[in-house]
Curated annotation (Swiss-Prot):
Protein name (database record): ATP phosphoribosyltransferase
Listed HAMAP family: HisG_Long
PROSITE patterns referenced in this protein's UniProt entry, alphabetically: ATP_P_PHORIBOSYLTR (PS01316)
Keywords attached to this entry: Amino-acid biosynthesis, ATP-binding, Cytoplasm, Glycosyltransferase, Histidine biosynthesis, Magnesium, Metal-binding, Nucleotide-binding, Transferase
CDD domains: PBP2_HisGL2 (cd13592)
Family: Belongs to the ATP phosphoribosyltransferase family. Long subfamily.
Organism from which the protein derives: Klebsiella pneumoniae subsp. pneumoniae (strain ATCC 700721 / MGH 78578)
Regulation of its activity: Feedback inhibited by histidine.
Phylogenetic lineage: Bacteria, Pseudomonadati, Pseudomonadota, Gammaproteobacteria, Enterobacterales
Subunit structure: Equilibrium between an active dimeric form, an inactive hexameric form and higher aggregates. Interconversion between the various forms is largely reversible and is influenced by the natural substrates and inhibitors of the enzyme.
Pathway as given in its UniProt record: Amino-acid biosynthesis; L-histidine biosynthesis; L-histidine from 5-phospho-alpha-D-ribose 1-diphosphate: step 1/9
UniProt-listed InterPro entries: ATP-PRT_HisG_long, ATP_PRibTrfase_cat, ATP_PRibTrfase_CS, ATP_PRibTrfase_HisG, HisG_C, N-reg_PII-like_a/b, N-reg_PII/ATP_PRibTrfase_C
Length: 299
């Protein structure tokens, strides 16, 4: 039986978000072995239990109060929310923050040889999908009637198999659609992973742990989005150098031994430093330009 004094977090056991979720928890300093097949893994250094489950079970576990937190794709979360509302329920939860992984889009796709003049082309058609409620909401808003063909996998083969006229499925690169003679015609929902919390009273110790975890997650995401930049720059062109780095904080300026014409500049930039920018910095007289990843960051 689970210990209710420990924070319970549900993550995807395997699939699109699994590896990124494990990496996030690890970078937040949670020491736990998630490479076994166990359903529940206990953290060694914090009162945290990690439940590894199917992704479409995570929203329900949070909404029903079985776990305290869940890392889940917004598409799966929204589908479960709409499903429960359709059954007359009033599901409750909090979205603590959007995460920086798991990006995808839910799109309509039709056979490549069929004309497309907008969603109206689907009126009265049969559409295969694993997301019937998201699809219904979108087409209801457009005033379009359709027949739903619910499939839990291999949705892209439905038109070729004669099961449906079109599909509504997750798309990342579009390669799978192309391989099955389909083309993406309309994006109906964009999704990323998010961290959600159950509704209801939370023990003070648990809430404090959640707040600590949120601070660490923010630091991990900021670190991944930032770079530490060091260079030597001519003193008379410092403002021009800084202007080339719009995402950077004001730099730390250090003197160079025996060189009064140049200084050492250190700064954190929240924007990617492209080769073109580095070439422009060099043209301004900058040298010894280093762009380094940041492991941890806290403001």
């Amino acid at each position: 039986m689970l210990d209710n004094t420990r924070l319970r977090i549900a993550i995807q056991k395997s699939g699109r978000l699994s590896e990124d979720s494990r990496e996030l928890l690890s970078r937040c300093g949670i020491k736990v072995n998630l490479h076994t097949q166990r359903l529940i893994a206990l953290a060694e250094n914090m009162p945290i239990d990690i439940l590894r489950v199917r992704d479409d079970d995570i929203p329900g576990l949070v909404m029903d109060g079985v776990v305290d937190l869940g890392i889940i794709g917004e598409n799966v979360l929204e589908e479960e929310l709409l499903s429960r509302r359709a059954q007359g329920e009033d599901p409750r939860y909090f979205t603590l923050r959007r995460l920086d992984f798991g990006g995808c889009r839910l799109s309509l796709a039709t056979p490549v040889d069929e004309a497309w003049n907008g969603p109206a082309a689907l009126d009265g058609k049969r559409i295969a999908t694993s997301y019937p409620h998201l699809l219904k909401r979108y087409l209801d808003q457009k005033g379009i009637s359709f027949k739903s063909c619910l499939l839990n996998g291999s949705v892209e083969v439905a038109p070729r198999a004669g099961l449906a006229d079109a599909i509504c499925d997750l798309v990342s690169t579009g390669a799978t659609l192309e391989a099955n003679g389909l083309r993406e015609v309309e994006v109906i929902y964009r999704s990323k992973a998010c961290l959600i919390q159950r509704d209801g009273e939370m023990a003070d110790a648990k809430q404090q742990l959640i707040d600590r975890l949120l601070t660490r997650i923010q630091g991990v995401i900021q670190a991944r989005e930032s770079k530490y930049i060091m260079m030597h720059a001519p003193t008379e062109r410092l403002e021009e150098v800084v202007a080339l780095l719009p995402g950077a904080e004001r730099p730390t300026i250090l003197p160079l031994a025996g060189d009064k014409q140049r200084v050492a500049m250190h700064m954190v930039s929240s924007e990617t430093l492209f080769w073109e920018t580095m070439e422009k910095l060099k043209a301004l007289g900058a040298s010894s330009i280093l762009v380094l990843p940041i492991e941890k960051m806290m403001e």
